[in-house]
Amino acid sequence: MYILNDILNLHRNIILKFNVGRRLRKLVGWSAVRVVLVLIGATIILVVISVLVVSTLAASSSVSSVSPIISTPTTEASRVKSWSGRSLSKGVNVQHFFFLPSHIGISFSRSGDGVEKRRFFIIKLLIRFILLVNS
């Protein structure tokens, strides 16, 4: 609820600053403008969530296509270890926060290949954007 209120305040400040929709405000009042702004904000949030879900599914399908057909106890143990994530002594772990497997690459550690670093960078930008919108 606080996020929607912050989005509403942000849109209201934009409308007041640039005098956008002055006739619309006079015609229908603030309540209708608020409803429209909340719908726009909710749409933006749903688009961001759907992009994250699609990228997660794409990453998990590419990992599953590479995995061996016959699984041995060592691969099962490594799979369980990858789902549990790293210990907190090695760094902050976001997998426990979002309940995501660690092979997606959302980890605040700089080790790994280029794909993992790119995913880390994208997630870091998304978190900064969300914090910027909420402030």
Swiss-Prot record:
The lineage of its organism: Eukaryota, Fungi, Dikarya, Ascomycota, Saccharomycotina. Almost completely overlaps SCD6. It is found in: Membrane. This is Putative uncharacterized protein YPR130C. The keyword Transmembrane applies. It is a single-pass membrane protein. It comes from Saccharomyces cerevisiae (strain ATCC 204508 / S288c). Keywords: Membrane, Transmembrane, Transmembrane helix. Its main location: membrane. The chain crosses the membrane at residues 35-55. GO terms for cellular component: membrane.
